[in-house]
Amino acid sequence: MIRYCIVLFLLITINLSSQTTIITGNAQGKPDKLVRVIVYDDLFSGLEKTIASSLTDPFGDFAFKLNIDNSQFAFLALELDKGEFYLTPGSSYRFEISSDSNLNRGSVFDRLPLMFEVFADDGGLQTSIEKFNIEYNDFIYNNVNRIYRTKDNSVVNSFIDYINENYSNDDLAYFDNYVNYTLASLKWLSRIKNNREVLQEYFINKPVLYFNIQYCDFFKEFFKSYFNSEKVFRYEDLIPVLNYSKSIT
């Protein structure tokens, strides 16, 4: 029965509404360099696509105008180096890449992220995610033994209560889902929630959040483990279903 419910929830549709997003920036001391905006074409398989590209002018300036449908995780790339940010429809962004952010010279596998300062007029999504990530990563770093190696869940429950109290934002649906599925992963990994409870609370009869990176990361992590343990079918078999459902919405 659970197997059929899993397939059914994957076919829930989403509504799209395209809006113009403006990106400007400057890469100090880097004229005539390729700048790109990259997003995931498919978060479930990790396929990327470039949605805008341009060369910096003699002063290092660049500008893009994009029509996007959904808030989503993105990369700003300068040549082969790239750094992370979050795109929101109808928003504007200003990037400052300092002159000491030298392009990496080594192997593409050893490259550091592109460092930049971003000024986002996006309703607060970028700063909200940055602030939440700092608190969440600090919590994991300082409590890793208690979270994963003991049965004492009090520290996790207290942290979840704190996050729910301080990071609820009904005006930012992407951020609310980002937080919700980050905490879902924490509950599952700390064994506060078992497989069946996670399925019922976070996936069955819930919309598929194709563009939310935390949802998709947890989806992949959970179902790979779930299918391996339950021997239902392989996670890889779900990707065509997910992509078909996305294509008809």
Language-model segments: residues:
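A non-transmembrane, solvent-exposed segment enriched in polar/low-complexity residues
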Residues: 19-171, 188-205
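Short solvent-exposed coil/turn linkers within tandem alpha-helical repeat scaffolds
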Residues: 169-174, 209, 213
